[in-house]
Design a protein with these regions (language model features):
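Short beta-strand edge/turn micro-motifs at domain boundaries
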Residues: 116, 123-207, 303-317, 333-383
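Primarily extracytoplasmic ectodomains and periplasmic/lumenal surface modules that are beta-strand-rich
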Residues: 51-52, 112-114, 230-231, 288-289, ...
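Hydrophobic beta-strand residues in large extracellular and virion-surface proteins
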Residues: 38, 89-91, 103-107, 173-175, ...
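Surface-exposed, charged secondary-structure patches
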Residues: 74-158, 253-329, 384-391, 399-403
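Short glycine-rich, low-complexity/disordered patches
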Residues: 56-63, 166-171, 235-250, 317-325, ...
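Core segments of small alpha/beta cavity-forming domains
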Residues: 28-82, 86, 198-270, 292
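Sec-dependent N-terminal signal peptides of Gram-positive bacterial secreted proteins and lipoproteins
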Residues: 3-29
């Protein structure tokens, strides 16, 4: 009897160990299957497989704010290839649910530093929009920077010209078993969180309205302004509209003023403050001294108008002379002025934007030259013309009386 009891106990233990062994083997097999599925998908991303990339990160999802969609082009595929060229991963843990219906794989992903890339992208996009705005105002180009294609061209340019550092992201990949008891079939669940993790948080960073601070945003405005050519600058700042003269005169004076900006403009951001969706950035602006230009112009104009030549020249020549004096005063100016300017920016939920950008920058740079000094000289010229006409009438009356 004792022998039978011992045998039964022994067989029970052996059966239990066998069952545990089989269960453990199945569990390890499930873990291996899950890991294999994840590894296969991530390897395809690592090997720059376009189809896998679009399966997890649809190209339209990266820039949901783009106004004009486009088909998936080779250029867009190249952009994703550039982004994933430093992609790598390391599986750290696999957890399979007790019923084998779900699994979670913990992965450490290595991608390009998305925060730096997103900041560069937003700055380049704003720079492009400012330039296109200047070009559009002079009628040479339409605003196309908001299209999906333009967004990818900017991203492609940044990835081609910059060597970005890498960053690591901890990611949990969820899988579900879509098979049956006889044959398991593990499938990765595609989620917004996974989509963003695979690009290192780039989608969230691009959507961050504060990715560029108010100071960073103003820096883009001012740096871009310095690089605009004469026509773009005068168009963007509305300099042409400052001068109430003929087109030729407008262009000449506007070009002279823009050249003064190129030679003298500089800035130093001193401080900033935020209040909700509003920010004020105090900036030290160095620019040409408009008061000095106007003083020189007025002095030379007064001297000319007091001369006999002004009476003899007639109204048209007086106008041409006053224009010549103003142009020379601008071209000959070497005096600069330094002033603190408070720039107001507003966050519209997408990014920080300079309020009334063209006029704000124009007033900060041109100062008292925001109004045309030629308007004053035109009034003075009318007075001279009236005095001349009166003198002519008086002379005519005197001659008639003598006769």
């Amino acid at each position: 009897m004792n022998i039978n009891k011992h045998l039964i106990l022994l067989f029970s233990v052996l059966f239990f160990l066998f069952a545990v062994s089989v269960s453990s083997g199945c569990f390890r097999k499930n873990e291996s299957d899950v890991k294999s599925v994840v590894r296969n998908e991530l390897d395809q991303l690592k090997n720059l497989d376009s189809e896998t990339t679009q399966k997890y990160i649809p190209y339209t999802e990266l820039f949901p704010d783009a106004t004009e969609n486009t088909d998936l082009t080779d250029e867009i595929n190249k952009t994703f290839s550039l982004f994933f060229r430093k992609f790598n991963y390391k599986i750290s843990d696999v957890i399979v649910g007790t019923a084998n219906h779900s699994a979670t794989v913990s992965v450490k992903l290595t991608t390009i530093d998305s925060k730096v890339l997103a900041r560069d992208f937003k700055a380049e996009l704003l720079r492009t929009q400012i330039t296109e705005s200047a070009q559009a105002q002079k009628g040479s180009i339409k605003d196309s920077s908001r299209s999906l294609e333009a967004h990818y061209l900017i991203l492609n340019h940044l990835l081609n010209t910059n060597d970005y550092d890498t960053a690591e992201t901890d990611c949990n990949i969820q899988l579900v078993n879509t098979g049956n008891n006889k044959k398991e079939k593990w499938k990765i669940q595609r989620t917004n969180s996974l989509e963003d993790d695979l690009v290192g948080g780039l989608i969230a960073d691009l959507a961050d309205p504060d990715i560029l601070s108010p100071e960073d945003t103003l820096t883009v405005y001012l740096d871009t302004l310095q690089k605009l050519d004469l026509k773009e600058m005068t168009s963007y700042l509305g300099v042409v509209n400052i001068m109430n003269t003929s087109d030729t005169a407008k262009n000449s004076i506007a070009s002279a003023l823009a050249e003064q900006i190129h030679k003298n403009f500089n800035y130093v951001i001193k401080s900033s403050s935020e209040n909700g969706y509003n920010a004020t950035v105090t900036t030290e602006i160095t620019t040409f001294d408009s008061d000095s230009i106007l003083a020189d112009y007025q002095e030379k104009l007064d001297k000319y108008l007091a001369s006999a030549d002004a009476v003899i020249d007639g109204s048209q020549k007086r106008y041409e002379k006053s224009f010549e004096i103003l142009l020379n005063s601008i071209n000959d100016n070497t005096v600069t002025t330094v002033n603190d300017v408070d720039f107001v920016l507003i966050n519209d939920g997408v990014s920080w934007k300079l309020q009334d950008e063209g006029n704000t920058l124009g007033n900060a740079i041109f100062g008292t030259l925001t109004n045309s000094p030629l308007e004053t000289s035109d009034s003075e010229d009318e007075n001279i013309s009236a005095d001349t006409d009166k003198q002519t009438d008086d002379n005519t009356s005197t001659e008639s009386s003598s006769n």
